[in-house]
Amino acid sequence: MRMKDLYAPTLKETPSDVETVSHEYLLRGGFIRKTAAGIYTYLPLGRRVLLKIENIVREEMNRIGAQEILMPILQPAELWKQSGRWDDYGPEMMKLKDRHERDFTLGPTHEEIVTDLVKNELRSYRQLPLVVYQVANKYRDEIRPRFGLLRAREFIMKDAYSFHSSWESLDETYELFKEAYSRIMERLGVKYMVIEAETGAIGGNASHEFVVPAKIGETNVLFCEKCGYQASDEKAEYKGEYTQEQEEEKPFKKVPTPGVKTIEEVSEFLGVPPSKIVKSLLYKGREGYVMVLIRGDLELNEAKLKAHLKDQSLRMATPEEILKDFGVPVGFIGPIGVDVKKVADHSVRGLKNFVVGGMEEDTHYVNANHPRDFKVDEWYDLRTMVEGDPCPVCGEPLKATKGIELGHIFKLGTKYSEAMKAYFMDENGEMKPFIMGCYGWGVSRTMAAVVEHFHDENGMIWPLSIAPYTVVVDILNMNDAEQKQVGEKIYQVLSEKGEEVVLDDREVSPGFKFKDADLIGFPIRINVGRSLKEGVVELKKRYSKELVKVNIKNGFGTLLETLEKMKREYDPKEAAR
Protein backbone atom coordinates (compact mmCIF):
# COMPACT_ATOMS: atom_id res chain seq x y z
CA MET A 1 0.00 0.00 0.00
CA ARG A 2 1.25 3.47 -0.90
CA MET A 3 0.75 6.17 1.68
CA LYS A 4 -0.46 8.62 -0.94
CA ASP A 5 -3.28 6.16 -1.76
CA LEU A 6 -4.04 5.03 1.79
CA TYR A 7 -7.23 6.51 3.21
CA ALA A 8 -5.79 7.44 6.61
CA PRO A 9 -6.63 11.09 7.26
CA THR A 10 -4.43 12.02 10.23
CA LEU A 11 -5.18 15.01 12.45
CA LYS A 12 -2.68 17.41 14.00
CA GLU A 13 -5.07 18.67 16.67
CA THR A 14 -6.89 16.65 19.32
CA PRO A 15 -10.71 16.79 18.97
CA SER A 16 -12.37 18.65 21.84
CA ASP A 17 -14.57 15.78 23.07
CA VAL A 18 -11.70 13.33 23.57
CA GLU A 19 -11.31 11.87 27.09
CA THR A 20 -8.78 9.07 26.69
CA VAL A 21 -5.46 8.40 24.98
CA SER A 22 -6.93 5.64 22.81
CA HIS A 23 -9.81 7.85 21.67
CA GLU A 24 -7.38 10.64 20.78
CA TYR A 25 -4.87 8.52 18.89
CA LEU A 26 -7.41 6.40 17.03
CA LEU A 27 -9.09 9.58 15.80
CA ARG A 28 -5.88 11.47 15.05
CA GLY A 29 -4.26 8.43 13.46
CA GLY A 30 -7.11 8.01 10.98
CA PHE A 31 -8.38 4.69 12.36
CA ILE A 32 -11.93 5.74 13.27
CA ARG A 33 -14.36 8.60 12.75
CA LYS A 34 -17.30 9.52 14.97
CA THR A 35 -20.73 9.26 13.35
CA ALA A 36 -22.76 10.06 16.46
CA ALA A 37 -22.32 9.69 20.22
CA GLY A 38 -20.97 6.18 20.78
CA ILE A 39 -21.17 5.26 17.07
CA TYR A 40 -18.06 5.03 14.89
CA THR A 41 -16.97 4.28 11.34
CA TYR A 42 -13.82 2.20 11.04
CA LEU A 43 -11.46 3.50 8.35
CA PRO A 44 -9.04 1.16 6.52
CA LEU A 45 -6.35 1.17 9.22
CA GLY A 46 -8.92 0.53 11.94
CA ARG A 47 -10.59 -2.19 9.93
CA ARG A 48 -7.27 -3.97 9.42
CA VAL A 49 -6.64 -3.97 13.16
CA LEU A 50 -10.17 -5.24 13.83
CA LEU A 51 -9.76 -8.07 11.33
CA LYS A 52 -6.51 -9.14 12.96
CA ILE A 53 -8.12 -9.14 16.40
CA GLU A 54 -11.05 -11.12 15.01
CA ASN A 55 -8.64 -13.57 13.41
CA ILE A 56 -6.84 -14.20 16.70
CA VAL A 57 -10.17 -14.72 18.46
CA ARG A 58 -11.46 -17.01 15.70
CA GLU A 59 -8.31 -19.12 15.76
CA GLU A 60 -8.59 -19.63 19.50
CA MET A 61 -12.31 -20.41 19.28
CA ASN A 62 -11.75 -22.93 16.50
CA ARG A 63 -8.88 -24.46 18.47
CA ILE A 64 -11.24 -25.47 21.30
CA GLY A 65 -13.88 -26.85 18.94
CA ALA A 66 -16.30 -23.93 18.80
CA GLN A 67 -18.21 -23.54 15.52
CA GLU A 68 -18.94 -20.15 13.97
CA ILE A 69 -22.49 -19.08 13.16
CA LEU A 70 -24.13 -15.69 12.57
CA MET A 71 -27.35 -14.72 14.32
CA PRO A 72 -29.71 -11.82 13.60
CA ILE A 73 -29.11 -8.46 15.21
CA LEU A 74 -32.84 -7.68 15.13
CA GLN A 75 -34.55 -9.85 17.75
CA PRO A 76 -38.27 -10.29 18.49
CA ALA A 77 -39.48 -9.26 21.93
CA GLU A 78 -41.30 -12.58 22.40
CA LEU A 79 -38.03 -14.43 23.03
CA TRP A 80 -36.89 -11.88 25.62
CA LYS A 81 -40.27 -12.05 27.33
CA GLN A 82 -39.92 -15.83 27.54
CA SER A 83 -36.61 -15.46 29.36
CA GLY A 84 -37.96 -12.68 31.58
CA ARG A 85 -35.34 -10.18 30.44
CA TRP A 86 -37.51 -7.86 28.34
CA ASP A 87 -38.23 -5.79 31.43
CA ASP A 88 -35.21 -6.82 33.50
CA TYR A 89 -32.45 -5.81 31.11
CA GLY A 90 -32.95 -2.12 31.75
CA PRO A 91 -32.84 1.09 29.72
CA GLU A 92 -29.63 0.01 27.94
CA MET A 93 -31.72 -2.23 25.68
CA MET A 94 -32.51 -0.54 22.36
CA LYS A 95 -36.17 -1.29 21.67
CA LEU A 96 -38.13 -0.53 18.51
CA LYS A 97 -41.40 -1.36 16.77
CA ASP A 98 -41.94 -2.44 13.19
CA ARG A 99 -44.74 -1.09 10.97
CA HIS A 100 -47.11 -3.64 12.51
CA GLU A 101 -46.40 -2.35 16.03
CA ARG A 102 -44.52 -5.52 16.96
CA ASP A 103 -41.73 -5.09 19.50
CA PHE A 104 -38.10 -5.83 18.65
CA THR A 105 -34.69 -5.10 20.09
CA LEU A 106 -31.29 -4.48 18.56
CA GLY A 107 -29.49 -7.31 20.29
CA PRO A 108 -27.24 -6.41 23.21
CA THR A 109 -26.54 -10.14 23.55
CA HIS A 110 -27.87 -13.39 22.07
CA GLU A 111 -28.74 -15.89 24.82
CA GLU A 112 -32.41 -15.91 23.83
CA ILE A 113 -31.80 -16.33 20.11
CA VAL A 114 -29.29 -19.16 20.50
CA THR A 115 -31.41 -21.01 23.08
CA ASP A 116 -34.44 -20.82 20.78
CA LEU A 117 -32.28 -22.07 17.91
CA VAL A 118 -30.85 -25.05 19.75
CA LYS A 119 -34.06 -26.17 21.45
CA ASN A 120 -35.57 -26.78 18.02
CA GLU A 121 -32.54 -28.71 16.73
CA LEU A 122 -30.90 -30.74 19.51
CA ARG A 123 -32.95 -33.56 21.02
CA SER A 124 -30.52 -36.01 22.61
CA TYR A 125 -27.60 -36.03 25.04
CA ARG A 126 -25.65 -37.73 22.23
CA GLN A 127 -25.59 -34.38 20.39
CA LEU A 128 -23.94 -32.64 23.34
CA PRO A 129 -21.83 -30.74 24.14
CA LEU A 130 -22.25 -28.09 21.46
CA VAL A 131 -20.29 -24.81 21.35
CA VAL A 132 -21.14 -22.09 18.84
CA TYR A 133 -19.91 -18.53 18.47
CA GLN A 134 -20.29 -15.45 16.32
CA VAL A 135 -18.50 -12.16 15.71
CA ALA A 136 -21.11 -9.46 15.26
CA ASN A 137 -22.30 -5.98 16.15
CA LYS A 138 -24.05 -5.42 19.46
CA TYR A 139 -26.12 -2.46 20.64
CA ARG A 140 -26.58 -0.87 24.06
CA ASP A 141 -28.20 2.48 24.68
CA GLU A 142 -25.54 3.81 27.02
CA ILE A 143 -26.77 6.80 29.00
CA ARG A 144 -23.43 8.49 28.42
CA PRO A 145 -21.24 6.96 25.72
CA ARG A 146 -17.66 7.85 26.56
CA PHE A 147 -14.01 6.92 26.14
CA GLY A 148 -14.40 6.30 22.40
CA LEU A 149 -14.57 2.59 21.64
CA LEU A 150 -14.46 1.63 25.32
CA ARG A 151 -18.07 2.59 26.02
CA ALA A 152 -19.93 2.76 22.72
CA ARG A 153 -23.55 2.25 21.75
CA GLU A 154 -22.63 0.09 18.75
CA PHE A 155 -19.69 -2.27 19.17
CA ILE A 156 -18.27 -5.53 17.86
CA MET A 157 -18.24 -8.63 20.05
CA LYS A 158 -17.43 -12.28 19.85
CA ASP A 159 -20.09 -14.12 21.82
CA ALA A 160 -20.04 -17.88 22.29
CA TYR A 161 -22.58 -20.24 23.83
CA SER A 162 -22.23 -23.81 25.04
CA PHE A 163 -24.86 -26.49 25.69
CA HIS A 164 -24.25 -29.48 27.96
CA SER A 165 -25.89 -32.51 29.47
CA SER A 166 -23.99 -32.23 32.78
CA TRP A 167 -22.32 -29.70 35.04
CA GLU A 168 -19.06 -31.59 34.66
CA SER A 169 -19.19 -31.02 30.91
CA LEU A 170 -19.86 -27.30 31.43
CA ASP A 171 -16.93 -27.08 33.85
CA GLU A 172 -14.62 -28.61 31.24
CA THR A 173 -15.72 -26.17 28.53
CA TYR A 174 -15.52 -23.25 30.96
CA GLU A 175 -11.87 -24.13 31.63
CA LEU A 176 -11.22 -24.40 27.88
CA PHE A 177 -12.51 -20.86 27.44
CA LYS A 178 -10.37 -19.65 30.33
CA GLU A 179 -7.33 -21.08 28.59
CA ALA A 180 -8.38 -19.72 25.18
CA TYR A 181 -8.94 -16.22 26.56
CA SER A 182 -5.56 -16.32 28.29
CA ARG A 183 -3.94 -17.23 24.97
CA ILE A 184 -5.70 -14.31 23.28
CA MET A 185 -4.30 -11.94 25.90
CA GLU A 186 -0.82 -13.40 25.46
CA ARG A 187 -0.99 -13.01 21.69
CA LEU A 188 -1.97 -9.38 22.19
CA GLY A 189 1.05 -9.00 24.44
CA VAL A 190 -0.80 -7.15 27.20
CA LYS A 191 -0.71 -7.61 30.95
CA TYR A 192 -3.99 -9.02 32.22
CA MET A 193 -5.85 -10.30 35.26
CA VAL A 194 -8.49 -13.04 35.53
CA ILE A 195 -10.91 -11.97 38.24
CA GLU A 196 -14.06 -13.31 39.87
CA ALA A 197 -17.02 -11.26 38.66
CA GLU A 198 -20.72 -10.66 39.21
CA THR A 199 -23.07 -12.19 36.64
CA GLY A 200 -25.39 -9.16 36.36
CA ALA A 201 -28.17 -9.13 33.78
CA ILE A 202 -26.69 -12.16 31.98
CA GLY A 203 -27.32 -14.36 35.01
CA GLY A 204 -25.86 -17.67 36.08
CA ASN A 205 -23.96 -18.88 39.12
CA ALA A 206 -20.29 -18.24 38.27
CA SER A 207 -18.41 -15.69 36.23
CA HIS A 208 -14.88 -14.45 35.46
CA GLU A 209 -13.62 -11.32 33.73
CA PHE A 210 -10.41 -10.91 31.76
CA VAL A 211 -9.17 -7.43 32.53
CA VAL A 212 -6.32 -5.26 31.21
CA PRO A 213 -5.04 -2.90 33.96
CA ALA A 214 -5.64 0.75 32.98
CA LYS A 215 -6.11 3.98 34.92
CA ILE A 216 -9.21 4.85 32.91
CA GLY A 217 -10.72 1.36 33.28
CA GLU A 218 -14.30 1.09 34.52
CA THR A 219 -13.80 -2.24 36.27
CA ASN A 220 -12.64 -1.81 39.86
CA VAL A 221 -10.40 -4.73 40.77
CA LEU A 222 -9.50 -5.86 44.28
CA PHE A 223 -6.57 -8.23 44.67
CA CYS A 224 -4.55 -9.86 47.43
CA GLU A 225 -0.77 -9.86 47.12
CA LYS A 226 -0.49 -12.71 49.64
CA CYS A 227 -2.87 -15.41 48.39
CA GLY A 228 -3.58 -14.23 44.82
CA TYR A 229 -7.32 -13.59 45.25
CA GLN A 230 -8.69 -11.31 42.49
CA ALA A 231 -12.25 -10.06 42.07
CA SER A 232 -14.25 -7.08 40.88
CA ASP A 233 -15.58 -4.80 43.59
CA GLU A 234 -19.08 -5.89 42.50
CA LYS A 235 -18.24 -9.49 43.38
CA ALA A 236 -15.82 -9.27 46.33
CA GLU A 237 -17.45 -10.47 49.55
CA TYR A 238 -16.89 -8.85 52.92
CA LYS A 239 -15.95 -11.51 55.48
CA GLY A 240 -14.32 -9.26 58.06
CA GLU A 241 -15.46 -8.21 61.50
CA TYR A 242 -18.58 -6.14 62.10
CA THR A 243 -19.02 -3.53 64.79
CA GLN A 244 -20.88 -4.89 67.81
CA GLU A 245 -21.64 -1.90 70.00
CA GLN A 246 -22.35 -2.64 73.65
CA GLU A 247 -23.88 0.67 74.80
CA GLU A 248 -27.35 0.82 76.35
CA GLU A 249 -30.24 1.64 74.04
CA LYS A 250 -31.49 5.20 74.49
CA PRO A 251 -34.99 6.49 73.75
CA PHE A 252 -35.21 7.57 70.15
CA LYS A 253 -36.43 11.04 69.37
CA LYS A 254 -37.15 13.18 66.38
CA VAL A 255 -34.89 16.21 65.93
CA PRO A 256 -35.05 19.10 63.44
CA THR A 257 -32.39 19.04 60.71
CA PRO A 258 -33.31 21.96 58.42
CA GLY A 259 -31.88 21.56 54.92
CA VAL A 260 -29.56 18.78 56.09
CA LYS A 261 -29.74 15.87 53.63
CA THR A 262 -26.41 14.20 52.89
CA ILE A 263 -24.47 11.92 55.24
CA GLU A 264 -21.73 14.54 55.48
CA GLU A 265 -24.21 17.31 56.33
CA VAL A 266 -26.03 15.18 58.92
CA SER A 267 -22.72 14.13 60.47
CA GLU A 268 -21.55 17.72 60.84
CA PHE A 269 -24.92 19.08 61.99
CA LEU A 270 -25.54 16.43 64.67
CA GLY A 271 -21.90 15.93 65.63
CA VAL A 272 -21.88 12.19 64.98
CA PRO A 273 -19.51 10.17 62.76
CA PRO A 274 -20.90 8.78 59.46
CA SER A 275 -20.55 5.28 60.94
CA LYS A 276 -23.33 6.18 63.43
CA ILE A 277 -25.74 7.10 60.63
CA VAL A 278 -27.76 4.56 58.63
CA LYS A 279 -28.50 5.41 55.01
CA SER A 280 -32.00 4.50 53.86
CA LEU A 281 -32.26 4.07 50.09
CA LEU A 282 -35.49 3.35 48.22
CA TYR A 283 -35.36 1.05 45.20
CA LYS A 284 -38.11 -0.06 42.81
CA GLY A 285 -38.30 -3.51 41.25
CA ARG A 286 -40.73 -6.13 40.04
CA GLU A 287 -42.37 -6.38 43.46
CA GLY A 288 -42.54 -2.67 44.19
CA TYR A 289 -40.46 -0.67 46.65
CA VAL A 290 -37.58 -2.02 48.70
CA MET A 291 -35.81 0.02 51.37
CA VAL A 292 -32.09 -0.71 51.62
CA LEU A 293 -30.21 0.11 54.83
CA ILE A 294 -26.44 0.45 55.10
CA ARG A 295 -24.00 2.18 57.44
CA GLY A 296 -23.35 5.78 56.45
CA ASP A 297 -19.62 5.41 55.87
CA LEU A 298 -20.10 2.53 53.38
CA GLU A 299 -21.22 2.44 49.75
CA LEU A 300 -24.06 0.21 48.59
CA ASN A 301 -23.15 -2.41 45.99
CA GLU A 302 -26.10 -2.48 43.57
CA ALA A 303 -24.84 -5.63 41.87
CA LYS A 304 -24.96 -7.51 45.18
CA LEU A 305 -28.42 -6.12 45.91
CA LYS A 306 -29.80 -7.27 42.56
CA ALA A 307 -28.15 -10.68 42.92
CA HIS A 308 -29.45 -11.28 46.45
CA LEU A 309 -32.99 -10.17 45.59
CA LYS A 310 -32.87 -11.94 42.20
CA ASP A 311 -34.24 -8.85 40.46
CA GLN A 312 -32.12 -7.22 37.76
CA SER A 313 -34.83 -4.60 37.18
CA LEU A 314 -34.12 -2.94 40.53
CA ARG A 315 -33.32 0.75 40.26
CA MET A 316 -33.11 3.63 42.66
CA ALA A 317 -36.45 5.41 42.98
CA THR A 318 -36.51 8.95 41.59
CA PRO A 319 -37.01 11.97 43.89
CA GLU A 320 -40.36 12.55 42.15
CA GLU A 321 -41.54 8.98 42.86
CA ILE A 322 -40.47 9.21 46.49
CA LEU A 323 -42.21 12.54 47.02
CA LYS A 324 -45.39 11.29 45.32
CA ASP A 325 -45.60 7.92 47.11
CA PHE A 326 -44.13 8.79 50.51
CA GLY A 327 -44.59 12.55 50.77
CA VAL A 328 -40.99 13.02 51.81
CA PRO A 329 -38.07 14.66 49.98
CA VAL A 330 -34.94 12.62 49.30
CA GLY A 331 -32.53 12.95 52.20
CA PHE A 332 -35.07 12.38 54.95
CA ILE A 333 -36.09 8.78 54.17
CA GLY A 334 -35.87 6.38 57.10
CA PRO A 335 -37.05 2.92 58.20
CA ILE A 336 -39.23 3.86 61.18
CA GLY A 337 -42.96 3.65 60.56
CA VAL A 338 -42.66 2.77 56.87
CA ASP A 339 -44.54 -0.23 55.51
CA VAL A 340 -42.17 -1.48 52.81
CA LYS A 341 -39.84 -4.46 52.57
CA LYS A 342 -36.54 -3.65 54.28
CA VAL A 343 -33.21 -5.29 53.55
CA ALA A 344 -30.02 -4.32 55.34
CA ASP A 345 -26.29 -4.75 55.14
CA HIS A 346 -24.77 -6.70 58.02
CA SER A 347 -23.01 -3.50 59.11
CA VAL A 348 -26.31 -2.21 60.53
CA ARG A 349 -26.95 -5.23 62.76
CA GLY A 350 -24.46 -4.37 65.49
CA LEU A 351 -25.12 -0.63 65.72
CA LYS A 352 -26.71 1.06 68.72
CA ASN A 353 -28.28 4.52 69.01
CA PHE A 354 -27.79 5.54 65.40
CA VAL A 355 -29.31 8.27 63.22
CA VAL A 356 -31.91 7.64 60.49
CA GLY A 357 -34.14 9.83 58.35
CA GLY A 358 -37.33 11.03 60.04
CA MET A 359 -39.74 10.41 57.12
CA GLU A 360 -40.57 14.09 57.36
CA GLU A 361 -38.90 17.05 55.69
CA ASP A 362 -36.04 18.63 57.71
CA THR A 363 -36.24 15.86 60.33
CA HIS A 364 -34.11 12.91 61.54
CA TYR A 365 -34.38 10.38 64.34
CA VAL A 366 -31.51 10.00 66.79
CA ASN A 367 -30.92 6.97 69.03
CA ALA A 368 -32.68 4.60 66.64
CA ASN A 369 -32.20 0.90 67.37
CA HIS A 370 -33.00 -2.37 65.65
CA PRO A 371 -35.15 -4.41 66.23
CA ARG A 372 -36.77 -2.14 68.79
CA ASP A 373 -37.79 0.63 66.39
CA PHE A 374 -38.11 -1.12 63.04
CA LYS A 375 -37.95 -4.57 61.51
CA VAL A 376 -35.46 -5.76 58.89
CA ASP A 377 -36.84 -8.48 56.61
CA GLU A 378 -33.56 -9.76 55.16
CA TRP A 379 -29.85 -9.34 55.93
CA TYR A 380 -27.10 -9.51 53.30
CA ASP A 381 -23.57 -8.45 52.49
CA LEU A 382 -24.39 -5.32 50.48
CA ARG A 383 -21.28 -3.20 50.90
CA THR A 384 -18.87 -2.25 48.13
CA MET A 385 -15.45 -3.54 49.09
CA VAL A 386 -12.58 -1.05 48.96
CA GLU A 387 -8.81 -1.08 49.22
CA GLY A 388 -7.72 -2.06 52.72
CA ASP A 389 -10.72 -4.29 53.41
CA PRO A 390 -9.74 -7.83 54.42
CA CYS A 391 -9.23 -10.48 51.75
CA PRO A 392 -12.17 -12.93 51.96
CA VAL A 393 -9.72 -15.83 51.56
CA CYS A 394 -6.76 -15.04 53.83
CA GLY A 395 -7.73 -11.84 55.66
CA GLU A 396 -4.82 -9.70 54.43
CA PRO A 397 -5.62 -6.10 53.37
CA LEU A 398 -6.71 -5.94 49.73
CA LYS A 399 -5.11 -3.74 47.09
CA ALA A 400 -7.13 -1.95 44.40
CA THR A 401 -6.59 -1.12 40.76
CA LYS A 402 -8.68 -0.32 37.68
CA GLY A 403 -8.96 -2.27 34.47
CA ILE A 404 -10.66 -2.57 31.10
CA GLU A 405 -12.80 -5.67 30.73
CA LEU A 406 -12.13 -7.48 27.45
CA GLY A 407 -13.49 -10.96 28.14
CA HIS A 408 -16.32 -12.19 30.36
CA ILE A 409 -17.35 -15.83 30.80
CA PHE A 410 -20.41 -17.19 32.60
CA LYS A 411 -21.78 -20.48 33.86
CA LEU A 412 -25.43 -19.88 33.03
CA GLY A 413 -26.72 -23.23 34.22
CA THR A 414 -30.38 -23.73 33.33
CA LYS A 415 -31.50 -20.07 33.63
CA TYR A 416 -32.44 -19.75 29.96
CA SER A 417 -33.23 -23.35 29.07
CA GLU A 418 -35.81 -23.65 31.86
CA ALA A 419 -37.38 -20.27 31.09
CA MET A 420 -37.59 -21.05 27.37
CA LYS A 421 -38.46 -24.74 27.75
CA ALA A 422 -35.32 -25.95 25.99
CA TYR A 423 -34.96 -29.65 26.83
CA PHE A 424 -33.05 -32.70 25.65
CA MET A 425 -33.49 -36.41 26.40
CA ASP A 426 -30.81 -37.81 28.71
CA GLU A 427 -29.38 -41.36 28.75
CA ASN A 428 -32.29 -42.50 30.96
CA GLY A 429 -34.93 -41.23 28.57
CA GLU A 430 -35.84 -38.26 30.79
CA MET A 431 -36.30 -34.72 29.51
CA LYS A 432 -33.78 -32.32 31.08
CA PRO A 433 -33.03 -28.61 30.53
CA PHE A 434 -29.77 -27.81 28.76
CA ILE A 435 -26.96 -26.68 31.04
CA MET A 436 -25.45 -23.62 29.40
CA GLY A 437 -22.43 -21.33 29.40
CA CYS A 438 -21.77 -18.07 27.58
CA TYR A 439 -18.52 -16.35 26.76
CA GLY A 440 -18.08 -12.79 25.49
CA TRP A 441 -15.08 -10.95 24.08
CA GLY A 442 -15.07 -7.25 23.16
CA VAL A 443 -13.40 -7.10 19.74
CA SER A 444 -13.67 -3.36 19.06
CA ARG A 445 -12.93 -2.61 22.71
CA THR A 446 -9.72 -4.64 22.40
CA MET A 447 -8.38 -2.18 19.85
CA ALA A 448 -8.80 0.72 22.29
CA ALA A 449 -7.49 -1.26 25.27
CA VAL A 450 -4.29 -2.17 23.44
CA VAL A 451 -3.70 1.51 22.62
CA GLU A 452 -4.27 2.42 26.27
CA HIS A 453 -1.68 -0.21 27.14
CA PHE A 454 0.89 0.57 24.43
CA HIS A 455 1.50 4.22 23.53
CA ASP A 456 3.81 7.13 24.15
CA GLU A 457 3.61 10.91 23.72
CA ASN A 458 3.93 10.52 19.94
CA GLY A 459 1.24 7.96 19.24
CA MET A 460 0.34 4.29 19.23
CA ILE A 461 2.77 1.37 19.62
CA TRP A 462 1.03 -1.62 18.05
CA PRO A 463 2.11 -5.17 18.87
CA LEU A 464 3.07 -7.04 15.71
CA SER A 465 0.10 -9.39 16.09
CA ILE A 466 -2.50 -6.69 15.36
CA ALA A 467 -0.56 -3.82 13.74
CA PRO A 468 -2.35 -2.57 10.61
CA TYR A 469 0.95 -2.84 8.73
CA THR A 470 4.28 -4.14 10.00
CA VAL A 471 6.70 -1.88 8.11
CA VAL A 472 6.65 1.63 6.71
CA VAL A 473 9.30 2.58 4.14
CA ASP A 474 9.91 6.34 4.24
CA ILE A 475 11.43 7.97 1.17
CA LEU A 476 12.73 11.12 2.82
CA ASN A 477 13.32 13.19 -0.32
CA MET A 478 10.95 12.51 -3.17
CA ASN A 479 13.04 14.80 -5.39
CA ASP A 480 16.04 12.46 -5.05
CA ALA A 481 15.84 9.92 -7.88
CA GLU A 482 18.08 7.39 -6.13
CA GLN A 483 16.03 7.51 -2.91
CA LYS A 484 12.84 7.02 -4.91
CA GLN A 485 14.32 4.11 -6.86
CA VAL A 486 15.71 2.31 -3.79
CA GLY A 487 12.59 2.99 -1.72
CA GLU A 488 10.41 1.55 -4.47
CA LYS A 489 12.69 -1.49 -4.77
CA ILE A 490 12.62 -2.18 -1.00
CA TYR A 491 8.84 -1.83 -1.07
CA GLN A 492 8.60 -4.25 -4.00
CA VAL A 493 10.91 -6.85 -2.40
CA LEU A 494 9.10 -6.75 0.94
CA SER A 495 5.69 -6.96 -0.75
CA GLU A 496 6.77 -9.98 -2.78
CA LYS A 497 7.92 -11.69 0.41
CA GLY A 498 4.45 -11.21 1.90
CA GLU A 499 5.42 -8.43 4.29
CA GLU A 500 2.66 -6.02 5.25
CA VAL A 501 4.35 -2.84 4.14
CA VAL A 502 3.44 0.77 3.41
CA LEU A 503 5.54 3.01 1.17
CA ASP A 504 5.40 6.65 2.22
CA ASP A 505 5.86 8.31 -1.15
CA ARG A 506 4.11 11.57 -0.31
CA GLU A 507 5.59 14.92 -1.27
CA VAL A 508 5.93 16.06 2.36
CA SER A 509 8.83 16.74 4.70
CA PRO A 510 10.70 13.92 6.50
CA GLY A 511 9.50 15.29 9.85
CA PHE A 512 5.89 15.07 8.71
CA LYS A 513 6.41 11.46 7.64
CA PHE A 514 8.09 10.55 10.92
CA LYS A 515 5.26 12.09 12.96
CA ASP A 516 2.61 10.22 10.99
CA ALA A 517 4.55 6.95 11.27
CA ASP A 518 4.81 7.34 15.05
CA LEU A 519 1.19 8.43 15.42
CA ILE A 520 -0.12 5.49 13.37
CA GLY A 521 2.26 3.17 15.21
CA PHE A 522 3.96 1.17 12.46
CA PRO A 523 6.17 -1.30 14.38
CA ILE A 524 9.24 -0.89 12.14
CA ARG A 525 10.32 2.06 10.02
CA ILE A 526 12.87 1.93 7.20
CA ASN A 527 14.37 5.32 6.31
CA VAL A 528 15.68 5.82 2.80
CA GLY A 529 17.48 9.15 3.07
CA ARG A 530 20.80 10.97 2.80
CA SER A 531 22.80 8.01 4.16
CA LEU A 532 21.92 6.21 0.93
CA LYS A 533 24.93 8.02 -0.59
CA GLU A 534 27.05 5.65 1.53
CA GLY A 535 24.85 2.73 0.51
CA VAL A 536 23.06 2.69 3.88
CA VAL A 537 19.42 2.67 4.96
CA GLU A 538 18.19 2.94 8.54
CA LEU A 539 15.81 0.68 10.46
CA LYS A 540 14.05 1.71 13.66
CA LYS A 541 11.65 0.03 16.06
CA ARG A 542 8.65 2.20 16.92
CA TYR A 543 9.45 2.40 20.64
CA SER A 544 13.24 2.74 20.30
CA LYS A 545 15.45 5.76 19.56
CA GLU A 546 18.15 3.53 18.10
CA LEU A 547 18.70 3.68 14.34
CA VAL A 548 20.12 0.45 12.94
CA LYS A 549 22.21 1.17 9.84
CA VAL A 550 22.25 -1.50 7.14
CA ASN A 551 24.45 -1.51 4.06
CA ILE A 552 22.55 -2.44 0.91
CA LYS A 553 25.34 -1.96 -1.66
CA ASN A 554 25.47 -5.71 -2.27
CA GLY A 555 21.72 -6.29 -2.22
CA PHE A 556 18.92 -6.59 0.32
CA GLY A 557 19.96 -9.82 2.06
CA THR A 558 21.31 -8.10 5.17
CA LEU A 559 18.32 -5.77 5.23
CA LEU A 560 15.90 -8.71 5.22
CA GLU A 561 17.89 -10.53 7.93
CA THR A 562 17.96 -7.41 10.09
CA LEU A 563 14.24 -6.89 9.60
CA GLU A 564 13.47 -10.47 10.65
CA LYS A 565 15.70 -10.10 13.71
CA MET A 566 13.95 -6.87 14.72
CA LYS A 567 10.57 -8.55 14.34
CA ARG A 568 11.65 -11.45 16.56
CA GLU A 569 12.90 -9.04 19.22
CA TYR A 570 10.02 -6.58 18.90
CA ASP A 571 8.27 -6.07 22.23
CA PRO A 572 6.02 -3.03 22.87
CA LYS A 573 6.45 -3.56 26.61
CA GLU A 574 9.99 -2.20 26.16
CA ALA A 575 8.42 1.25 25.79
CA ALA A 576 7.40 1.23 29.45
CA ARG A 577 10.81 0.14 30.76
Curated annotation (Swiss-Prot):
InterPro entries: aa-tRNA-synt_IIb, aa-tRNA-synth_II, aa-tRNA-synth_II/BPL/LPL, Anticodon-bd, Anticodon-bd_dom_sf, Pro-tRNA-ligase_IIa, Pro-tRNA-synth_IIa_bac-type, Pro-tRNA-Synthase_IIa_type1
Molecular function in Gene Ontology: aminoacyl-tRNA deacylase activity; ATP binding; proline-tRNA ligase activity
UniProtKB keywords: Aminoacyl-tRNA synthetase, ATP-binding, Cytoplasm, Ligase, Nucleotide-binding, Protein biosynthesis
Locations listed in the record: Cytoplasm
EC number(s) from the headed UniProt entry: 6.1.1.15
Pfam families, sorted: HGTP_anticodon (PF03129), tRNA-synt_2b (PF00587), tRNA_edit (PF04073)
Gene3D superfamilies per record: Anticodon-binding domain (3.40.50.800), Bira Bifunctional Protein, Domain 2 (3.30.930.10)
Gene Ontology process terms (BP): prolyl-tRNA aminoacylation
GO cellular component, one term: cytosol
Catalyzed reactions per annotation: tRNA(Pro) + L-proline + ATP = L-prolyl-tRNA(Pro) + AMP + diphosphate
Domain of life, source organism: Bacteria
Keyword Ribosomal protein recorded: no
Chief location bin: cytoplasm
Function of the protein: Catalyzes the attachment of proline to tRNA(Pro) in a two-step reaction: proline is first activated by ATP to form Pro-AMP and then transferred to the acceptor end of tRNA(Pro). As ProRS can inadvertently accommodate and process non-cognate amino acids such as alanine and cysteine, to avoid such errors it has two additional distinct editing activities against alanine. One activity is designated as 'pretransfer' editing and involves the tRNA(Pro)-independent hydrolysis of activated Ala-AMP.
NCBIfam families for the chain: PRK09194.1, proS_fam_II
Family: Belongs to the class-II aminoacyl-tRNA synthetase family. ProS type 1 subfamily.
Domain-related comment: Consists of three domains: the N-terminal catalytic domain, the editing domain and the C-terminal anticodon-binding domain.
Subunit structure: Homodimer.
Protein name as catalogued: Proline--tRNA ligase
Species annotation: Thermotoga sp. (strain RQ2)
Gene that encodes the chain: proS
